[in-house]
Regions:
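Membrane-embedded translocation segments of transport machinery
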Residues: 130, 134-282, 306-307, 314
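Helix-loop-helix connectors at the membrane interface of multi-pass transporters/channels
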Residues: 35-36, 69-101, 204-209, 214-226, ...
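Select transmembrane alpha-helical segments in multipass membrane proteins
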Residues: 2-6, 46-59, 107-113, 173-185, ...
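Membrane-water interface regions at transmembrane-helix termini and the short interhelical loops
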Residues: 46-62, 97-99, 112-136, 201-209, ...
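Loop-to-transmembrane helix boundary motifs in multi-pass membrane proteins
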Residues: 103, 107-108, 222-229, 267-270, ...
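Inter-helical loop and helix-membrane interface segments of multi-pass membrane transporters/permeases
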Residues: 31-53, 66-126, 155-182, 247-253, ...
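C-terminal membrane-solvent junction of multi-pass transporters and transport-like membrane proteins
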Residues: 50-55, 292, 299-312, 344-402
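Juxtamembrane transmembrane-helix boundary signature
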Residues: 6-42, 66, 237, 241-244, ...
């Protein structure tokens, strides 16, 4: 609960401001990460070098996200064919362990994500897929509410609600308030994907009808709603089924199947949930692939087809170590972290905060785009206006807070 409080605070004072900055650069330039900075920067400056950081961040994100996205497809198939029918909590946990222990299974579903993702981008049907995904996301939002209500009604769920929503400051002090705050800051950056140009690519297609402050609030509010509702599904269910809340990413693959199994028509609800999650994760895959493709086309002058043919094997081969890190290479440690944890650290602990600092300085510094031009772009359109008096916070406090995240993550 203390983490959640910090998370909400940092979304407000860090997340929304940086989102407006990335959106502003994208909408004003109508370009990809590197070309966007090159279009807006003062002549002769090197802000556009940040595009290489964005390119690296997108690549590293994809070489582990495609593996996790493959888990979604795998679980959809397992629910669809009835593999979970009649399972108890221990067997559900064993199913997840068996999945990650099988390198061929992980590589197959990862490869399926990579192949289909690049095929969609190569065929130019990403926008058509986006329309389908929007409908699926509305369905997912409705299903999340249903699952949250169901979790809250489970016997023994009250302890999970207390753990999630009632702050335990003594426990937070034991863990270190600074550590909790830094983790919440990292989570705010990661959930919004700010700092590596993803929002900039999205904004390059945006109209100028609405102010970017309002757009940033709406994006953050929707993201926060999903995150909070996910907590209301998972933590009460953890309490009800005796699953430790500290199990991390596997929670969705251990706790939720238990919820579905104990629901009427559980196979249907489980299949529906994981097909929605598959579309959600796959939309992220195609969006980041589009970012990679767009950057390479702009930077190297390649055609779309050539770019896809070059990137596909690089992403596929680059993703194999993450898949093997759960089994064949499970003993491999890099600075005390497993392969997935190290790749996640590079993105959420290093590239995202570093990129966010660059966006912040570019938008407020007279040696970059400048605060006045940034503010003019943010306030273009109807909706919430960004006040000029906020400039000192954006110029001095915001970069220092982001720097704290970066330094804390490296310690």
């Amino acid at each position: 609960a203390v983490f959640v409080l910090f998370y909400l605070l940092f979304l407000l004072i860090l997340g929304i401001p940086v989102v407006t900055m990335e959106l502003a650069v994208g909408r004003a330039s109508h370009k990809s990460a590197m070309m966007g900075f090159k279009t807006l920067e003062p002549k002769g400056s090197k802000w556009h070098w940040h595009g290489w950081i964005c390119l690296l961040g997108s690549f590293v994100l994809m070489i582990y996200y495609t593996v996790v996205s493959g888990w979604m497809v795998d679980y959809f198939w397992k629910f669809l064919n009835g593999s979970f029918n009649g399972m108890g909590p221990e067997k559900v946990a064993a199913t997840f362990d068996a999945m990650v222990a099988d390198p061929y299974e992980l590589i197959f579903f990862m490869g399926l994500n990579v192949l289909v993702g690049f095929a969609v981008c190569a065929g130019g049907v990403a926008k058509s897929l986006e329309k389908v995904t929007k409908v699926m996301m509305l369905g997912l939002l409705g299903l999340i509410v249903i699952l949250a209500v169901n979790s809250l009604l489970l016997p023994g769920s009250a302890k999970g609600v207390e753990f999630y929503l009632l702050p335990d400051w003594n426990r937070a002090v034991e863990a270190g308030i600074g550590n909790v705050a830094a983790a919440a800051m990292n989570q705010a950056f990661f959930t919004l994907s700010v700092g590596q140009g993803s929002m900039e690519i999205f904004a390059s297609y945006m109209s100028r009808n609405n102010t970017l402050g309002g757009e940033a609030v709406r994006i953050t509010a929707l993201d926060t709603f999903v995150a909070l509702m996910a907590g209301l599904i998972i933590f009460p269910a953890c309490s009800a089924f005796g699953v430790e809340p500290s199990e991390g990413p596997s929670l969705i693959f251990v706790t939720l199947p238990n919820v579905f199994i104990n629901m009427s028509f559980g196979q249907f609800w489980g299949s529906l949930f994981f097909v929605f999650m598959t579309f959600a994760s796959f939309s992220t895959v195609t969006a980041v692939f589009e970012s990679l493709i767009g950057n390479c086309m702009d930077d190297f002058g390649w055609s779309r087809k050539k770019t896809v043919l070059i990137l596909l094997p690089f992403v596929f081969l680059g993703s194999i170590p993450c898949a093997l890190g759960f089994n064949v290479w499970s003993d491999v440690q890099i600075a005390g972290k497993g392969i997935l944890d190290m790749e996640d650290f590079l993105v959420s602990g290093l590239i995202l905060p570093l990129g966010s600092i660059i966006f912040a300085l570019f938008c407020v510094s007279k040696y970059g785009w400048g605060f006045d031009k940034y503010l003019e772009e943010v306030n273009t359109g109807t909706g919430m206006k960004m006040p000029r008096w906020i400039r000192p916070y954006f110029c001095y406090v915001l970069p220092l807070l982001i720097l704290f995240v970066l330094v804390k993550g490296l310690m």
